Design a protein with these regions (language model features):
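Hydrophobic anchor residue at the start of the ABC signature
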Residues: 175
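ABC ATPase NBD coupling module
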Residues: 71-86
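Helix-to-loop junction immediately C-terminal to a conserved catalytic motif
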Residues: 55
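The feature captures the beta-strand-to-loop junction immediately N-terminal to the Walker
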Residues: 40-42
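Conserved ABC transporter NBD signature motif
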Residues: 60-71
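A short, flexible loop at the N-terminus of ABC-type nucleotide-binding domains that lies
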Residues: 1-28, 38
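ABC-family P-loop ATPase nucleotide-binding domains
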Residues: 89-169
Length: 257
């Protein structure tokens, strides 16, 4: 299986205005493939909206941006196909009643059915079942290793319910699920929310490792770590409630995938 190929990200005077005002504006980015990009700013400053816009899930209204070979907003679908999201409230929520193994199996099945090219989708049912199962296992094992999640270390292994995971374990699982599709760009929201200093350090070490392996990472945070490409969102008059409403409206238009 081919390794991930990170996507370069550029933006100039990038902005998004909704019916309630600007979610963000005047954003500039210049990051090469395999970069760790930290979107830093206070809550309510449009950080999540910027993350969703750069991954083709919200439509920008000002300026220009490119993600790999996709120009935004004209080629949002291409940006969506090349990227994946993790730990985004309301978008990638884990089901607390399902186990870790069930989440991973579901994602592998979805990837097999919808994640490849049209040619792969048509060929998939014709491949031997053992071959398909082996590829799915390889994807899962590779994603778990990259996310630093050891199933054997969990209370009940793969049968551990999501509701029983620690906060950091749940974040690692969300990242692993996103990596099953081997995206060129990984977007992670709220990387440092409600985490201790030690846990934050673990998360940044994880995201730096993923970036070093080739996948470009865009991470929303309160404070950017050393060595990251720092992108700031400008505070607006929005409240968090308003920001959440605009995010929901945009996702209803473009889809959550």
């Amino acid at each position: 299986m081919d390794g991930p190929r990170g996507l370069g990200v550029t933006a100039s005077d990038f902005g998004l205005e909704g019916p309630r005002g600007w979610a963000f504006r005047g954003v500039g980015v210049d990051a090469g493939p395999g970069s760790l990009i930290a979107v830093a700013g206070p809550s309510g400053s449009g950080r999540t909206c910027l993350l969703l816009a750069l991954t083709g899930r919200m439509r920008s209204t000002e300026g220009t941006a490119t993600v790999g070979g996709a120009t935004l907003p004209r080629q949002m679908a291409a940006a969506r196909r090349a990227s994946a999201l993790a730990h985004v409230p309301g978008v990638t929520d884990l089901d607390p009643a399902l186990t870790v193994g069930e989440h991973l199996l579901e994602r592998a099945l979805l990837q097999r059915r919808f994640g490849g090219s049209l040619k792969d989708s048509l060929r998939g049912p014709l491949r031997p079942r053992a071959e398909r199962a082996a590829e799915g296992k390889l994807r899962i094992d590779s994603a778990l290793a990259a996310a630093g999640l050891d199933r054997e270390a969990l209370p009940k292994g793969s049968r551990t319910a999501v509701r029983d995971l620690e906060r950091l374990e749940a974040l690692r699982l969300s990242v692993a699920l996103a990596l099953v599709g081997r995206p060129g760009l990984l977007g992670v929201d709220d990387t440092d929310l409600k985490l201790s200093d030690a846990e934050r350090a673990e998360v940044w070490a994880l995201l730096k490792s993923i970036a070093q392996s080739g996948t470009t990472v865009v991470a929303v945070c309160g404070e950017a770590p050393d060595g990251a490409v720092r992108v700031s969102t400008r505070p607006t008059h929005h409240t968090s409630e308003t920001d959440d409403k605009e995010t929901a409206d945009a996702l209803a238009e473009t889809g959550r995938s």
